[in-house]
Amino acid sequence: VAVDAALKAGEEILSIYTDPASDFEIERKADHSPLTIADRKAHVTIATILNETPFPVLSEEGKHLEYDTRRNWDVMWIVDPLDGTKEFIKRNGEFTVNIALVKAGVPIIGVIYLPVKKELYFAGQEIGAYKLSGITTLEDDATLDKLVAASVRLPQDLQRDRFVVVASRSHLTPETEAYIDAVKQEHKHVELISSGSSIKICLVAEGKADVYPCFAPTMEWDTAAGHAIARAAGMEIYQADKK
């Protein structure tokens, strides 16, 4: 159901993204970050599908419930309908649809879809992490087993001769730059990749990057889906100020 929701939201986003007449109807949220009609439409698409399940939905573009209200939810969906709105507005294709199922504070299912690249990352606590390329819709007879069979297991065994750091294209903070400088002192050959949205976490889970440092403020919907994928690929997300 999460994959179906992500793909349908991606289709909705692309219909706006590829429309040459679209000005994206950009608004500003309370924190001054951009919001477009695509964010709103993707949210409605996902919420309509996920609301058919027994679990509540926490979405970046939905009604923001106080933490005291939702902290006792044992199982819930955490959604970012359009992660990387700045990248969407720039039309560089580096935006994603993020959906996670979280149980007792632990992300156990994660789905991240890249509409422009038609790439789907998905993971489950019991099945591992996978990447499927060239997908836009689910077949009528689609099953999880068929999805897994058509996908590549993560991480891939990629041979690299350098330490790869992937960092934010839109939020490269002084703290991140200092971290990268420290990595360069530790490793002889360091390559820096810049990317937008949750693609960065996917690149680490995939084995194309070694680390993604982030020192900018983040919310649950920024990391939940990527965290599930990283965990299922045998990796982890840590707080920067803790060992």
Where are these regions (language model features)?
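Short, Asp-centered acidic motifs that coordinate Mg2+ and/or phosphate
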Residues: 56, 109, 210-211
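Short, surface-exposed acidic/glycine-rich loop or hinge patches that mediate macromolecular interfaces
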Residues: 40, 62, 170-171, 198, ...
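Oxyanion/phosphate-interacting regions
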Residues: 1-6, 10-11, 147, 177-186, ...
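N-terminal subdomain of lithium-sensitive/metallo-dependent phosphomonoesterases centered on the IMPase/IPPase/PAP
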Residues: 1-82, 158, 178-181, 185, ...
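Acidic beta-strand-loop-alpha-helix segment within the catalytic core
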Residues: 100-201
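Residue-level signal for inorganic ion chemistry
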Residues: 13, 39, 50, 85, ...
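Glycine-rich active-site/cofactor-binding loop and its immediate structural neighborhood
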Residues: 73-112
